[in-house]
């Protein structure tokens, strides 16, 4: 997968799976992103968003404790201009619709290596 690098952007990766976080970090770093932080739960994501204020958040939907959708809701309540991309191995239309209604800017499915990430990041950063 050869994608053109973008201008630098800071990102927060939220996933309870270390493997999934590493995969996202690798892809996003390859296209010009700088890791602002990692979170393993929804609660952790909300706190880290408040402290780090990244340009983009990549949030898993299903996590123990606070789900990604609830963390998205809390982040959007904190900052209505937050740019959150939901990530899941589940392609459930109801979850996608709910995430978009609550303010998610995009939705991608795992594995992230098969996603046109530079195009998605460019789109989300421009809106």
Role assignments for model-derived ranges:
Residues 52-58:
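Active-site beta3 strand of CheY-like receiver
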Residues 70, 91-106:
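Alpha4 helix (beta4-alpha4-beta5 surface) of REC/receiver domains from two-component response regulators
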Residues 41-44, 67-70:
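Acidic catalytic/metal-coordinating carboxylates
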Residues 18-37:
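Two-component/phosphorelay signaling modules centered on CheY-like receiver
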Residues 63:
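Receiver (REC) domain active-site loop signature in two-component systems and cognate sites
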Residues 94, 112-121:
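C-terminal output helix
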């Amino acid at each position: 997968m050869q994608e053109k690098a973008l201008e630098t952007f800071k990102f927060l990766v939220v996933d309870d799976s270390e493997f999934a976080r590493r995969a996202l970090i690798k892809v996003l770093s390859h296209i010009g992103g700088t890791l602002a932080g990692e979170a393993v739960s929804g609660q952790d994501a909300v706190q880290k968003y408040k402290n780090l204020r990244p340009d983009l958040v990549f949030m898993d939907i299903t996590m123990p404790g606070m789900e990604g959708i609830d963390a998205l809701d809390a982040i959007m309540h904190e900052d209505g201009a937050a740019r959150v991309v939901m990530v899941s191995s589940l392609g459930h239309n109801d979850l996608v619709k709910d995430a978009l209604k609550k303010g998610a800017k995009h939705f991608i499915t795992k594995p992230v290596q098969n996603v046109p990430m530079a195009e998605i990041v460019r789109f989300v950063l421009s809106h």
